[in-house]
Amino acid sequence: MNRLAQPATRSVVKTFQRKSSGSFYGSNNVEGFKESYVTPLKQAHNASETWKKIFFIASIPCLALTMYAAFKDHKKHMSHERPEHVEYAFLNVRNKPFPWSDGNHSLFHNKAEQFVPGVGFEADREKH
């Protein structure tokens, strides 16, 4: 009976022995922990640099071109005189007055560009 008990104890001892590669920190891969966080940051930095280049190479010239086109359109619009206003029955209908000011002006009224019924244009266009 003693011979049967010995092999069982040896196998139990072998199964309970911890296979260790060294100290506590070495077995938990602390060195690789930092690298696992730094590697995606390096990749993100490369992607952000790519998008910065795309912005400076594509977006800024497009913005400049759009600003130039808007400036030219504004100059063309301001170069000719304002046409005579034609009063149509369906324009500037006032069934009841607006609840602000004198009731005859819209909320975002532009004196130089919007016609007021009964008054006309309140100001001339500025030349600039």
Swiss-Prot record:
Residues 1-19 form a transit peptide. CDD domains: Cyt_c_Oxidase_VIa. Residues 72-128 are mitochondrial intermembrane. The keyword Transcription does not apply. It is a single-pass membrane protein. It is found in: Mitochondrion inner membrane. Keywords: Membrane, Mitochondrion, Mitochondrion inner membrane, Oxidoreductase, Transit peptide, Transmembrane, Transmembrane helix. Residues 20-53 are mitochondrial matrix. Pathway: Energy metabolism; oxidative phosphorylation. InterPro entries: Cyt_c_oxidase_su6a, Cyt_c_oxidase_su6a_CS, Cyt_c_oxidase_su6a_sf. One of its GO terms (cellular component) is respiratory chain complex IV. The chain crosses the membrane at residues 54-71. Gene3D superfamilies: Cytochrome c oxidase, subunit VIa (4.10.95.10). GO terms for molecular function: enzyme regulator activity; oxidoreductase activity. GO terms for biological process: mitochondrial electron transport, cytochrome c to oxygen. Pfam families: COX6A (PF02046). Belongs to the cytochrome c oxidase subunit 6A family. Component of the cytochrome c oxidase, the last enzyme in the mitochondrial electron transport chain which drives oxidative phosphorylation. The respiratory chain contains 3 multisubunit complexes succinate dehydrogenase (complex II, CII), ubiquinol-cytochrome c oxidoreductase (cytochrome b-c1 complex, complex III, CIII) and cytochrome c oxidase (complex IV, CIV), that cooperate to transfer electrons derived from NADH and succinate to molecular oxygen, creating an electrochemical gradient over the inner membrane that drives transmembrane transport and the ATP synthase. Component of the cytochrome c oxidase (complex IV, CIV), a multisubunit enzyme composed of a catalytic core of 3 subunits and several supernumerary subunits. The complex exists as a monomer or a dimer and forms supercomplexes (SCs) in the inner mitochondrial membrane with ubiquinol-cytochrome c oxidoreductase (cytochrome b-c1 complex, complex III, CIII). This is Cytochrome c oxidase subunit 6A, mitochondrial. It comes from Caenorhabditis elegans. The gene is cox-6A.
